[in-house]
Design a protein with these regions (language model features):
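Nucleotide/phosphate-binding catalytic cleft detector across ATP-hydrolyzing
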Residues: 1-17, 21-79, 84-214
């Protein structure tokens, strides 16, 4: 395999199914991705709703998906990415406000400091997952809007204001579930970097990058 080629293992875990694929990525061609093999296994539907059984079944489906795609493709992925769908994560939106009687300069450092403080506060609270466990992990964070003196702006830095408002969106997942999925992947693929993402943030990034800013 050339230095321009990399193989990734990609998984999609939702409430209704688990899917997986080995994807060959090339940096010297367009299109630059080729699906080498893929499979999807539907979840087992039962009338008896039991959280622990639900988690166990999802992990068992993940094991089956891994076994199938590894049997169909001999490549050894260098990285692993998992996209989580509901109910495996929760989305929270926080409004961060900063005010001063005297005008101040809005800087990237100031915004990052406010975001870091808010993230630290989120980490101190119990996760919203009930039976999934209290410990949670922040998967993604994104500033979805910044207002100066009440007006939304796409270029806030180096401008004077007396009021700053940031809209912060984070996705959170139960640590016990992430650890379970990660352990299953490492048993099959070894010590590969594992990255978790969510369907919500994937859609946001695609929309942000494709739609014009007005």
């Amino acid at each position: 395999m050339s230095s321009h080629e990399h193989v990734f293992a990609v998984f999609d875990i939702s409430s209704s199914s688990v899917a997986g694929a080995h994807v060959l990525s090339r940096t010297d061609t367009c299109p630059n991705a080729l699906i080498l093999t893929s499979v999807r296994i539907d979840a087992v539907v039962t009338d008896d709703i039991n959280i622990q059984r639900f988690i166990t079944q999802a992990n068992r489906s993940l094991e089956q998906v891994i076994s199938t795609i590894r049997a169909q493709d001999v490549h050894k992925p260098s990285q692993i990415q998992i996209s989580l769908a509901s109910p495996w994560y929760s989305t929270e939106t926080r409004i961060i406000s900063y005010r001063s009687e005297k005008p101040f300069i809005c800087t990237k450092k100031l915004v990052e400091s406010l975001v870091d403080t808010e993230i630290a506060d989120i980490k101190k609270t119990d996760g919203p997952f009930g039976s999934y466990g209290k410990d949670s992990v922040i998967i993604e964070k994104q500033l979805s809007g910044i207002k100066l003196n009440g007006y939304l702006t796409h270029e806030p830095y180096d401008k004077k204001a007396t009021e700053l408002e940031c809209t912060l969106t984070v996705t959170i997942a139960p640590k016990t579930v992430l650890d379970l999925f990660s352990d299953t992947l490492r048993r099959s693929y070894g010590a590969r970097p594992i990255r978790f993402t969510t369907g919500a943030f994937t859609a946001f990034i695609v929309a942000r990058d494709r739609l014009p800013i007005e």
